Regions:
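Membrane-water interface segments that mark the loop-to-transmembrane alpha-helix transition
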Residues: 1-9, 35, 40, 44-101, ...
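Short runs within selected transmembrane alpha-helices of multi-pass transporters and secretion channels
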Residues: 5, 9-13, 17, 33-43, ...
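Interfacial/gating helices of multi-pass transporter permease domains
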Residues: 17-43, 188-192, 196, 214-234, ...
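Helix-loop junctions and terminal segments of transmembrane helices
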Residues: 18, 47-64, 229, 233-272, ...
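Membrane-interface helix-capping segments at transmembrane helix termini in multi-pass transporters
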Residues: 24-35, 63-76, 85-108, 150-157, ...
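Alpha-helical transmembrane segments of multi-pass membrane transport and lipid-handling proteins
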Residues: 52, 75-102, 145-146, 169, ...
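Interhelical loop/hinge segments that connect adjacent transmembrane helices in multipass membrane
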Residues: 127, 131, 153-155, 160, ...
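Membrane-proximal transmembrane or re-entrant/amphipathic helices at the cytosolic face
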Residues: 390, 409-450
């Protein structure tokens, strides 16, 4: 049910994007992305690590019969988060006007909604989570379709604010209100909450900082163009997060001697290869069919998003050098390295964007993603090398070859040359691919017969 809801929400997100691209002018759509992502960014920062804390402590409290503590943990951070959103929105209303206020608050509330949805997941109420998350998006899409000829920033904002607030009230009512045990709860969660805070505090920068910085140098129409590519790229990134999230608890349960064993090393290399080819699959989809996909989720005026989509997905391919290593570091308690890796990416991205965008325009933004990813890979591999340096070198060479074939295809359209290079990489990895398939087969068999 969870994965069905994920797929449906994934689909509805692109239906929503299509509606906006058809009925909203490009510059107005850019303003929409700026204001909505501003709300998501600020709301995401003020989550303050509580989603991860919920996932840890809510199941424990219910297991031990301490439901009142669980409800206090759910409600107080969520209510405070909502109140902070109202307070922050007041200056926006005064200085930026009603449209900006409505859109900012509408998308800020999405983060408050996510706190209650995290509580549902923590209680394994997958059906309730799936229904509320899908119904919220479906309602927004239906109302936007009904209002399509009259869509403005204000109508889009009113629809989102009304629906999000309604579902916030629905989710609020699902949990009995209890605030008294909060002091005792905070004492118990404090240490883990600090860990969660450092784990999640930089996440909004990855998702939204580009939307906030682009308007400093470029018109809103350029932001809307870039966001089409970014939304597609983020869709791929979200699907690639799933195997990492599924693997993290498996690693966490292993003892030190197990992590150092030959068997674990074999399985880890198999997982790295699986993750690499899963990422390569998305990259090739965007490279060969990217123009059609852009048309599918938007209109012909956004076709210029195609090269940005390919470049963004290529940075995702570069990140395979350290993505699984990062999961290993986080799962074994190396939170400082995890935090500093994120910090390096954010700082290097902002600096390169501020330097490149005035000179290269929108391509400066896209190249900033690549530069930040390369700097982060260098930092991570220097501080937390898991494999032999020669293995990382081979992986980097594969990525370089893939980049060369992509440039050749995009400039000349020579499809056969691209297929030849990809086939050569698969041939080189063929022995490792067979091992990966064997490990995967054994894992599936073990999970079916515990």
């Amino acid at each position: 049910m969870f994965y069905l809801a994920f797929a449906l929400n994934f689909l509805m997100g692109f239906v929503l994007l299509k509606i906006l691209a058809i009925y909203v002018p490009q510059d107005i759509l850019g303003k929409y992305f700026f204001l909505s992502n501003s709300g998501l960014f600020v709301g995401g920062l003020l989550l303050l690590g509580f989603p991860l804390t919920f996932q840890r402590f809510i199941p424990l409290y219910f297991r031990d019969g301490k439901e009142e503590k669980a409800h206090a943990l759910i409600h107080l951070p969520s209510v405070i988060h909502f109140i902070l959103g109202l307070l922050i929105s007041v200056p926006i209303l005064i200085f930026k006007g009603l449209d900006a206020f409505i859109l900012f608050l509408a998308f800020y509330i999405v983060n408050t909604v996510s706190l209650y949805q995290t509580a549902l997941i923590s209680l394994v109420k997958i059906f309730e989570y799936s229904i509320t998350s899908f119904a919220r998006l479906l309602t927004i899409v239906c109302l936007l379709l009904i209002s399509a000829p009259l869509l403005t920033l204000r109508t889009i904002g009113i629809i989102n604010l009304a629906v999000n607030f309604a579902f916030l009230l629905i989710l609020f009512s699902m949990f009995p209100l209890a605030l008294k045990p909060w002091k005792e709860v905070f004492t118990e969660i404090r240490e883990y909450w600090i860990y969660s805070l450092f784990t999640q505090i930089l996440s909004p920068f990855f998702y939204f900082i580009d939307s906030l910085l682009i308007p400093l140098y470029l018109p809103y129409s350029e932001l809307s163009l870039f966001q089409i590519a970014r939304k597609l790229d983020m869709g791929a990134r979200q699907t690639l997060e799933v195997p990492l999230q599924l693997t993290a608890p498996i690693i966490s349960f292993k003892k030190t001697d197990e992590l150092l064993s030959k068997e674990f090393a074999e399985k880890y290399r198999a997982f790295r290869l699986f993750y690499f080819y899963l990422t390569l699959f998305w990259f090739l989809i965007f490279e060969f069919f990217g123009k059609n996909i852009v048309l599918l989720v938007s209109t012909s005026q956004y076709l210029e998003a195609y090269p940005h989509l390919v470049l963004l997905s290529f940075t995702l391919l570069i990140s395979t050098l350290y993505a699984t290593d990062t999961t290993l570091a986080r799962s074994t308690g190396n939170i400082k390295l995890f935090f500093y890796k994120d910090l390096v990416w954010v700082v290097s991205f902002i600096l390169t964007l501020l330097v490149l965008t005035p000179k290269l325009g929108l391509f400066g933004v896209t190249l900033s993603f690549g530069a930040a990813t390369i700097v982060t890979a260098t930092f991570h591999l220097y501080n937390f090398p898991v494999l032999h340096p020669f293995e990382y070198l081979l992986e980097a060479l594969k990525i370089l070859v893939i980049g060369i074939q992509a440039m050749t295809f995009m400039t000349s359209g020579r499809f056969f040359f691209s297929i030849l290079l990809i086939a050569s990489i698969i041939a080189i990895d063929f022995k490792q691919i067979k091992m990966t398939l064997r490990v995967l087969k054994n894992y599936i068999a073990a999970s079916q017969n515990p």
